[in-house]
Regions:
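Glycine/Thr-rich beta-alpha phosphate-binding loop at enzyme active sites
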Residues: 90-104, 130, 135-166
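Short beta-strand/loop segments at the ligand-binding rim of alpha/beta enzyme cores
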Residues: 5-10, 56-70, 111, 116-129, ...
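Conserved beta-strand positions in the central sheet of alpha/beta enzyme cores
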Residues: 9, 40-42, 61, 93-96, ...
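N-terminal amphipathic alpha-helix/helix-capping segment at the start of soluble metabolic enzymes
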Residues: 1-21
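Catalytic cores of alpha/beta
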Residues: 71-85, 129-143, 176-180, 184-195
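Charged helix-capping and loop-helix junction motifs
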Residues: 23-27, 74-80, 106-112, 159-167
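Surface-exposed amphipathic alpha-helices with a cationic face
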Residues: 1-2, 31-34, 49-57, 108-120, ...
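Glycine/small-residue-rich loop that forms an oxyanion/phosphate-binding "nest" at active or ligand-binding sites
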Residues: 57-106
Length: 195
């Protein structure tokens, strides 16, 4: 975490329905991000993670977005996606840590202990929507908390992003690293996040 602390992590992701969808393009975007001063990359799918790691020597936060009909969770929702990401050797794996039902019917409180048991040495980032999610994630043994999903879940829809009140409260109460994520588009917002 020391390599990314206090720096900008750039998300290099494109879904199949988007014009820049290609592992080669995401790798070039990661290269451009590094040239621009990024200290880390957030990437979706094992293929993109592999391509990006070949292109840049920055830490990669890997995730795998998959839609399931029976769950709102789409960021690394099941063990199947975690297993797939592990083949790409990311530095960190991000997964939805909200208190919603996963595709297999489990919650983060029952799912994450299984993940940690299977991959005890991996660094895991909790993508959270609320203060409560972040504190729960720390208690469950996540290594990093992110404000990724604030404003994107039914309970937080309509919340102004970036979610500075949530960020401030988590920064005071967490003992693990916190990543401000989501809705940071302007330098002033970034400065406020670091304040």
């Amino acid at each position: 975490f020391a390599q990314i602390k206090g720096g900008l992590i750039v998300s290099c992701q494109a879904l199949e329905t988007e014009p820049l969808y290609s592992s080669k393009i995401m790798a070039r975007m990661a290269f451009a991000a590094k040239e621009g001063g990024a200290v880390g990359i957030r990437a979706n799918t094992p293929e993109d993670i592999i391509a990006i790691k070949k292109e840049v020597d920055l830490p990669v936060i890997g995730l795998y977005k998959v839609d399931y009909d029976n769950s709102e969770i789409y960021i690394t929702p099941t063990m199947k996606e975690i297993d797939a990401i592990m083949t790409a050797a990311p530095d960190i794996i991000a997964l939805d840590a909200t208190n919603r039902k996963r595709p297999d019917g489990s919650t983060i409180e029952t799912f994450f202990p299984e993940v940690r048991k299977k991959y005890p040495d991996m660094i895991f980032m909790a993508d959270c929507a609320s203060y409560e999610d972040g504190m729960r994630a720390q208690k469950l043994g996540f290594d990093i908390v992110g404000t990724t999903l604030c404003g994107y879940t039914p309970d937080t829809k309509g919340t102004e992003i970036p979610c500075f009140p949530m960020l401030e409260k988590l920064a005071q109460d967490l003992t693990i690293p916190l990543i401000a994520e989501g809705g940071i588009w302007e330098p002033q917002q970034l400065q406020k996040a670091f304040a």
